[in-house]
Amino acid sequence: MQFNEIYIRCLGFQAPMSDCWDNVIVGMKVEVENTDCDNFSEDFPDSFWVASVLEISGYKALLRYEGFGDNCSKDFWVNLCSSSVHPVGWCATRGKPLIPPKTIENKFQDWKDFLVRRLTGARTLPSTFYSKVQDSMKSRFRCDLNLEVVDKNRISHVKVATIEKIVGKRLQLRYYDSQPNEDVFWCHEDSPLIHPVGWARRVGHTLDAPPAYVDRCSKGLRDKDDATEDLFPMGMKLEAIDPLNLSEICAATVKQVLNDGYLMIRVDCYDEDPNLVDWFCYHITSPCIFPIGFCAKNELPLTPPKGYLPNTFNWNEYPCSHWFCSSDRPMHKFTTGMKLEAADLMNPQYVCVATISRVVDRLLKVHFDGWEEEYDQWLDCASCDIYPVGWCELVSRRLEPPRPPNSVEG
């Protein structure tokens, strides 16, 4: 499906498994629980069978048990990233038998031969798929860390807050002076609304903080629970003139952010130097650095990262977590009508069923299903507040359903 293929793999850097979704295709085979079975025993309380992926939408897949042919009566949806979905061979490694569904158990005399024929040459999930799911949802932050975050009630200020909870890389933050019964603030860990301890003082931003916090920041002192700069990653991708070969524009990476807008940049076409001598300093306003897609837009040759061919390199297929912000970023493939799960930025504790109602360049107009258009929100195509279908289920977070027709606020 378009949503799965484009969003999770190419643009959903904040979505778990975005870097390995190429392994998930229609037609692949998996082993799942057989719910159409009564052949249980004490040794095998669960029954499993092979199923084919018929359709993919976000993390969700429509499956059909092998042997049903064109019969869709037992088709069912699952979250492919859940622990109940396994690669072919999983049962064999655990000594579990594969038992055909009761509805079709007499359809073939030799089920083993049937499976061999159906599985020969078929694709399945990698054996490490589920462990990668778990790894992809790990946050680089931890609970009890202190941060500086935009004050939701006075957005011209930042305020000291503490991480209370982490769900799927979304952080639940409590301001230092909040009462226990007051609302918390939610945002993604990659949100531009949060900053490390000491950020406001360094850049001259207005800060609301306890006197003891201000005092130790002014003295350069750190607490064990302070969020530090290393939790706010470098790694932004851009295109830059090669300082060692001024005739070429190359794929490059921001390796370090210095004060006053200076960046340490490394050109990606060379072997990485362990002594960091291949880093070069550019100012963020330098005419020698460009947003992703600059060369393509202007029909200029781009020297790709090492290991990639110039004629086939595509930024949308290159694994990177951050992009140099510009409207010139390569065009996404979101389209009107696509379904997703989106945080309501006016009430970011809620993640809701939503639809893309309009696309203008890199901007997406997100409509919350069941609500009036006045509640629509414009989001960037790379926003960390939009997710594929099935994300809430994956991270065990409540998904706010569409508002029922004719419901009244209040």
What are these regions (language model features)?
Residues 1-410:
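Eukaryotic chromatin- and chromosome-associated nuclear factors
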